[in-house]
């Protein structure tokens, strides 16, 4: 890692894929090691999580190192629970994830405001108005939201054929109109 980054002024390390918090000790070791090894450089960390298993210890640790945390939350309960279930028991995820979001916001409000983001997935044919309304009604600004458009033909993101591209353009236009309403 050092050899690869020795000539850059800033090092960015990302944790994502599956659920990175399942191996929190490894994440903590990487952050501790990297901040010591690169003490003369700026080191930034970011992570994408489903938000279901974050603990108070993790929240405080990530706040200490200003980890940019992106939580996969699709919006209100009826949207989140439609496709996001716990693998082990098939139960819905919204209540657990949303309670953890509120815990993060209350426990580390400054870090939450500056470093916590949301990554909702929007299915084909859906206009994300309910998702935006949910976030807005919970005092989450649109600049903290990064929407992903899912492709139901598989697990891939949008395939760029004419039909899907037009759906994507239409959805983005509707979203812009929605966000610019008074």
What kind of feature is each model-predicted range?
Residues 78-98, 102-182:
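Radical SAM enzyme [4Fe-4S]-AdoMet core and its adjacent flexible, acidic
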Residues 2-6, 69:
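Aromatic-lined, polymer-binding surfaces characteristic
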Residues 1-2, 10, 56-57:
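Catalytic alpha/beta active-site cores
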Residues 11-13, 45-47, 69-71, 114-120, ...:
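Hydrophobic faces of well-ordered beta-strands that scaffold small-molecule active sites
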Residues 8-20:
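Active-site groove signature of glycoside hydrolases
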Residues 5-10, 38-43, 110-115, 141:
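Short helix-terminating capping/connector loops at secondary-structure junctions
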Residues 2-3, 35, 102-105:
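Generic structural signal for well-ordered alpha-helical scaffold segments
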């Amino acid at each position: 890692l050092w050899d690869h980054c020795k000539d850059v002024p800033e090092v960015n390390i990302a944790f994502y894929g599956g659920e990175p918090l399942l191996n929190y000790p490894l994440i903590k070791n990487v952050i501790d090691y990297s901040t010591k090894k690169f003490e003369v450089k700026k080191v930034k960390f970011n992570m994408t999580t489903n938000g279901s298993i974050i603990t108070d210890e993790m929240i405080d640790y990530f706040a200490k190192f200003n980890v940019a945390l992106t939580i996969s939350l699709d919006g209100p309960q009826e949207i989140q629970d439609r496709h996001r279930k716990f693998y082990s028991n098939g139960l819905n995820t919204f209540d657990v994830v949303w309670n953890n979001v509120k815990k993060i916001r209350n426990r580390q409000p400054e870090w939450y405001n500056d470093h916590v983001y949301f990554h909702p997935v929007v299915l084909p044919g859906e206009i994300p108005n309910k998702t935006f309304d949910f976030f807005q009604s919970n005092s989450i600004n649109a600049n903290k939201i990064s929407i992903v458009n899912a492709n139901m033909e598989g697990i891939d993101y949008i395939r760029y054929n004419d039909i899907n591209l037009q759906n994507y353009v239409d959805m983005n236009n509707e979203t812009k109109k929605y966000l610019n309403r008074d």
